């Protein structure tokens, strides 16, 4: 389900960027930069037990709901959720599968000739000519949900 309410998206960004021990960080600076350079935002949060075929299919269906026209940047956070203190594993292969789903959606719809993947704080306004995917990996503790979570915020011009 696509979230369009800016207050809900702000809350989601605070959860994404809050006090979580991030492995590769998306922080509030990234979100605020996206928010200030966008006329509007859309977001979604997908919770799943694993990134096997059913989880990836769930992600594909959720991503299809995003319109691509006018999209200029995507914040993507892949989060392991567990009740234990240790980080719930997110394997490199799983991370790549998720990035591929997001990339293919925007590429297939010809929003940009190419997508640029980079880690946060490498953002530069002159550099961002196409749709950028800014991504991060993190972990959070929860007593309710154990598994994995994918958070997506898309900024539109």
Regions found by a protein language model. Give the residues of each.
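Tubulin/FtsZ superfamily GTPase core signature
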Residues: 1-157
């Amino acid at each position: 389900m696509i979230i369009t309410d800016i207050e809900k998206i702000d809350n989601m960004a605070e959860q994404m960027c809050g006090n979580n021990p991030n492995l590769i960080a998306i922080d509030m600076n990234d979100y605020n930069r996206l928010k200030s350079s966008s006329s509007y935002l859309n977001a979604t949060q997908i919770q799943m037990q694993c990134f096997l075929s059913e989880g990836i299919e769930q992600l594909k269906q959720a991503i299809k709901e995003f319109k691509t026209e006018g999209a200029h940047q995507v914040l993507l956070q892949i989060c392991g959720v567990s009740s234990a203190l240790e980080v719930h594993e997110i394997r490199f292969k799983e991370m790549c599968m998720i990035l591929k789903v997001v990339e293919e959606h925007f590429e297939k719809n010809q929003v940009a000739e190419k997508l640029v993947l980079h880690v946060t704080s490498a953002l530069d306004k002159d550099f961002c000519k196409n749709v950028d995917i800014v991504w991060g990996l993190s972990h959070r503790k929860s007593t309710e949900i154990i598994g994995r979570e994918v958070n997506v915020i898309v900024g539109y011009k």
